[in-house]
Amino acid sequence: MTLQIGVIGCGAIGQDHIRRLTRTLSGARVVAVNDIDPQQARDAVTKYGLDAEIYGDGHEVVAAADVQAVLVTSWGPTHEAFVLDAIAHGKPVFCEKPLAVTAEGCMRIVEAEVAHGKRLVQVGFMRPYDEGYRALKRVIDSGQIGAPLMLHCAHRNQSVGERYTTDMAITDTLIHELDVLRWLLGEDYASAQVVYPKKTRHASAHLADPQIVLLETASGVRIDVEIFVNCQYGYDIQCEVVGEQGIAKLPDPPAVGLKHAARQSVEIMTDWKERFIASYDVELQAFIDGVRQGALTGPSAWDGYAAAVAADACVRAQQSGAVEPIAMAERPAFYRG
């Protein structure tokens, strides 16, 4: 069976996923598209040679009789309504982050999915599909380094634009760590604090950069995450797990080691899309396979809710300077195991 997908949102991310579905992945095809800018939708159909209907409204895509699953890559504040509509129609939906712009919105999706009685939602957190993170989790789960005690992490971007604001260090950047570190450790966060080192001269006047986020998990694991979005030298993701009897480190992406002109060097990537391109492929293929097999296994609506609650606490911590509690609702039995 070829899964027939409707895509809502044909901007950069939407078109990148359309490219995957059309040229890279197997078992699916795009049969419907929509974008707030009709020309964007037409351009996507032309560029990728789609045999797809262009709809003027995203809800029409959800309701279309030939659409079996929905891909939501539209503007963030529209995600909640489209995901809820897909659940109401009983159609599986892959939603790029954020699942909703508030924790309350995420909880409405959780409640709708639980009421439906079957998992329909996968959230677009791709790092759990990165082979480096998967290898790191295998080491942690094996017990080889003992119980994790501390994590030292960094998320560095070469630079960001003028529109990037201090809170976006949490909602656009740290959000990936909030998801993947919770997945690595298999437990929720208990508190968050944000501290500000000396500001880099490369940051815009309105942006606090770098920032250090301090997290504590329910069992007492301490995590520090450096967010430095104007580091200048490249795109660099680091994660070191300190255990009771050893240390495990996220491997850097493969790169040629160069010895030349009395120097030894390794190239560092500058683009986040290049760093995680394979992960995007794997996560979307997992969604296709999960729908076809009748069981989604990727990041759930509950994972989207958990990330939103933690992000809200981190933003409060940015503003208060205090240690902020991270209080989540009780996890429904629907999402356990």
UniProtKB/Swiss-Prot annotation:
Gene Ontology BP annotations: inositol catabolic process
InterPro entries per UniProt: Gfo-Idh-MocA_inositol_DH, Gfo/Idh/MocA-like_OxRdtase_C, Gfo/Idh/MocA-like_OxRdtase_N, MI/DCI_dehydrogenase, NAD(P)-bd_dom_sf
Catalysed conversion reaction: myo-inositol + NAD(+) = scyllo-inosose + NADH + H(+)
Stated role: Involved in the oxidation of myo-inositol (MI) to 2-keto-myo-inositol (2KMI or 2-inosose).
HAMAP family on file: IolG
Database matches in PANTHER family: INOSITOL 2-DEHYDROGENASE, PTHR43593
Name this polypeptide is given: Inositol 2-dehydrogenase
Gene coding for it: iolG
